[in-house]
Swiss-Prot record:
UniProt-recorded Gene Ontology molecular function terms: metal ion binding; tRNA-guanosine(34) queuine transglycosylase activity
Recorded coiled-coil stretches: none
Active site: 93, 268
Protein name as it appears in the record: Queuine tRNA-ribosyltransferase
Note accompanying the cofactor annotation: Binds 1 zinc ion per subunit.
Catalytic activity annotation: 7-aminomethyl-7-carbaguanine + guanosine(34) in tRNA = 7-aminomethyl-7-carbaguanosine(34) in tRNA + guanine
Gene symbol of the encoding locus: tgt
Its EC number(s): 2.4.2.29
C-alpha cells in the first residue's frame, strides 16, 4: 500500500490509498469511510450492494473471525476476500478492542490476554504474535497492531502503564508481521487516553518503530467530544504527513466532519448499519426515525438529495410499513440508504477540499441540521489565553 497526498485545505487532507492486489490496482480515495463487516459481511448486504453505495474498502473483525469460522476454514478458502467474495481492500482490527471489552472475562499480562471464549466458554489466549498470524491468514490489506484500548475514564497512571505496554506490543506486532513475510500494510495505534503528554510518547514510540499508517485509538469510548477534538488537534500534527491517519470506531456524520477538520483520513463505524436496523436514517438535515407514526402515509422519499436505490424507488410510507411488519427488506433498504449517505458525505468532503472550500462546506453542513459549528479546541485555548 502507498499513500498519496494531493492537497490540503487547512488541516483537511485530500489523497488516496493505492493497493496492488492479485486482481489489479485498487484505489481508495481519502478521506474515506469504511463500512464494518464484523463477521465477513456487512449485515444484510451482498458485496455488490456494498460497492454500489460507493464503498472502496471494508473493515473485518479479527477477533470474531478467529472464533468463527477460524483460521483453518479461512485458509481453505484462500483468505477473507475469497471467503466473503469482496476482492477490494480490507482492513482488519487486531482483536484488542473486543478482548478488552470482555471485562471480567479476561486477564491481561505482559504476554497477552487470557479470556473466556464468549461462544463456548473455553479459555483462550490472544497475543500480539497471534493477532499478526490470524490477520496474515485473513489476507488483510491493512493489518492493525495488537494494543490495549485504554478505557475511559482512566487515571494518568493507568493510562501511562497501558500506553507503555501497547508500545511494547506494537514492537512485537511489527517483529512478527515481518517474520511472516507479510507484504501488506501494518498500522500502529496511538494510545494514551485523554492525556496529551502520554499521546506524545505513544506517537514518538510508534514512529520510531515505523509503520505504514497511524491510527488514533482510545477515543469515542465515552469521553466528552471536547476531549476527542483536543486530542486529535494535538496528535495529528505529530503524525508524519506522508502517512495515512485513521480514527478508529468513529462515528456520527458530524464526527467524520470534525475528524477531517483536524487532519484525519480514514474512519470506520457500525453506526450507519446498526442505526439502519433500528429505523434511524441519516438525511441531509438530520435523522428520520422511520418508526414514527407520522410517516405512515408519507409519499416522499427519505432524502430528495440522495441518489441511493432506496430513495430512488421507495417512499417513507413504504419503509415505515416494512419496519412495522418486521420485513427483512426494510432493514436492507435502510442499510443501503445509510451506507450511501456516508459515502456521499465523504465524496462531498473530498470535493470541498479539492475546491478550497472545506470550511464553507462545514458551515453549510451544520446549517442544514440547525446546529452550531463546534469550535476548534486550540481556538478556545488561545481565547482563554
Amino acid at each position: 500500500m502507498k499513500y498519496e497526498l494531493d492537497k490540503t485545505d487547512g488541516n483537511a487532507r485530500r489523497g488516496r490509498l493505492v493497493f496492488e492486489r492479485p486482481q489489479g490496482t485498487f484505489t481508495v480515495e481519502t478521506p474515506a469511510f469504511m463500512p464494518v463487516g464484523t463477521y465477513g459481511t456487512v449485515k444484510g448486504m451482498t458485496p455488490e450492494e456494498v460497492r454500489a453505495t460507493g464503498a472502496e474498502i471494508l473493515l473485518g473483525n479479527t477477533f470474531h473471525l478467529w472464533l468463527r469460522p477460524g483460521q483453518e476454514v479461512m485458509r481453505k478458502h484462500g483468505d477473507l476476500h475469497d471467503f466473503m467474495q469482496w476482492h477490494r481492500p480490507i482492513l482488519t482490527d487486531s482483536g484488542g478492542f473486543q478482548v478488552f471489552s470482555l471485562g471480567k472475562l479476561r486477564k491481561i499480562t505482559e504476554e497477552g490476554v487470557k479470556f473466556q471464549n464468549p461462544i463456548n466458554g473455553e479459555r483462550i489466549f490472544l497475543s500480539p504474535e497471534k493477532s499478526m498470524e490470524i490477520q496474515y491468514d485473513l489476507g488483510s490489506d491493512i493489518v492493525m497492531i495488537f494494543d490495549e484500548c485504554t478505557p475511559y475514564p482512566a487515571t494518568f497512571d493507568y493510562a501511562k502503564k497501558s500506553m507503555e505496554m501497547s508500545l511494547r506490543w506494537a514492537k512485537r506486532s511489527r517483529d512478527r508481521f515481518d517474520e511472516l513475510g507479510n507484504k501488506n500494510a501494518l498500522f500502529g495505534i496511538i494510545q494514551g487516553g485523554v492525556y496529551e503528554e502520554l499521546r506524545k510518547v505513544s506517537v514518538e514510540g510508534l514512529v520510531n518503530i515505523g509503520f505504514d499508517g497511524y491510527a488514533v485509538g482510545g477515543l469515542a469510548v465515552g469521553e466528552p467530544k471536547e476531549d476527542m477534538h483536543r486530542i486529535l488537534e494535538y496528535v495529528c500534527p505529530q503524525i508524519p504527513a506522508d502517512k495515512p491517519r485513521y480514527l478508529m470506531g468513529v462515528g456520527k456524520p458530524e464526527d467524520l466532519v470534525e475528524g477531517v477538520r483536524r487532519g484525519i483520513d480514514m474512519f470506520d463505524c457500525v453506526m450507519p448499519t446498526r442505526n439502519a436496523r433500528n429505523g434511524h436514517l441519516f438525511v441531509s438535515d438530520g435523522i428520520v426515525k422511520i418508526r414514527n407514526a407520522k410517516y405512515r402515509e408519507d409519499t416522499s422519499p427519505l432524502d430528495p438529495e440522495c441518489d441511493c436505490y432506496t430513495c430512488k424507488h421507495y417512499t417513507k410510507a413504504y419503509l415505515y410499513h416494512l419496519d412495522k411488519c418486521g420485513e427483512i427488506l426494510g432493514a436492507r433498504l435502510n442499510t443501503i440508504h445509510n451506507l450511501r449517505y456516508y459515502q456521499r458525505l465523504m465524496a462531498q468532503i473530498r470535493q470541498a477540499i479539492e475546491e478550497d472550500r472545506f470550511e464553507a462546506f462545514v458551515q453549510e453542513f451544520y446549517a442544514k441540521m440547525g446546529k452550531p459549528v463546534p469550535p476548534m479546541q486550540s481556538e478556545i485555548k488561545s481565547d482563554e489565553g
